[in-house]
Amino acid sequence: FREKAPLAATRDMYLDENGKVINNDIGPIDHFSIKAVGVPGTVAGLELAHESLGSLVWSDLIAPSVKLARQGIPITFKLHDDFNNPRRKGWFGQYPSSEKIFYKASGEPYLPGDLWVQSDLGDTLERIQNNGKEGFYSGKTAELITKFMKENDGLITLEDLQKYDAIERKPIKNSYRNHEIISMPPPSSGG
C-alpha cells in the first residue's frame, strides 16, 4: 500500500527559482530530506487486508512483533553492514532520534551478535495491536510523528495522517513466453 503525498506538498517544492533540483549535503533534496517523506500506508493497508482476507485475531498477529521489538533481536552481519553503509550512516545521522535507534548510546555501531532492542517501536506496535490503524494514524503515535515533522520542517500533519485511506488496486497482468506476469499497477514502487 502506497504512501501518499502530504497535503502541503507541491509540484515544484524541490525546484529552485531557476527550475533546477535543489540539493542538500546528502544529495537531491527530493530523495534525501524530510520533505520527501510520504504519509505511510502500510498500517492501513495491513488492516484492510486483514479485514478482507484475515482469519486470525489482529492482536494475536501483532503480538510477536511487539515482543521482538521489546526483547530485541540479534544484529546479523547483514544488519551491521547496512547500518554502517556510508550512505545510510548519513541518513541515520541526520536526526538524534534516528541515531538513537540505529547506534548504541555511545554512538558506536551495533556489532554482529549484539541485541538490538527497540522499545519505542514496541510501544507503537502495541498501540496498533490494541487500536488497529487508529493506533497509528491517531493518538500518541500520530502526535509523535507530527511533532517530529513540525520540529524538523517536515510536511506531514495530523490531518494528513487522519485522512489516509488504503486503496485496494487491481493487479496488472500480462503474459510473456508462456508465463503469466502479475504486478502492481501504477502508482507502485518496484512494480
Regions found by a protein language model. Give the residues of each.
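Glycine-rich and small/hydrophobic secondary-structure elements
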Residues: G191
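Noncatalytic scaffold domains of N-terminal-nucleophile
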Residues: F1-G132, F136-S138, A142-S188
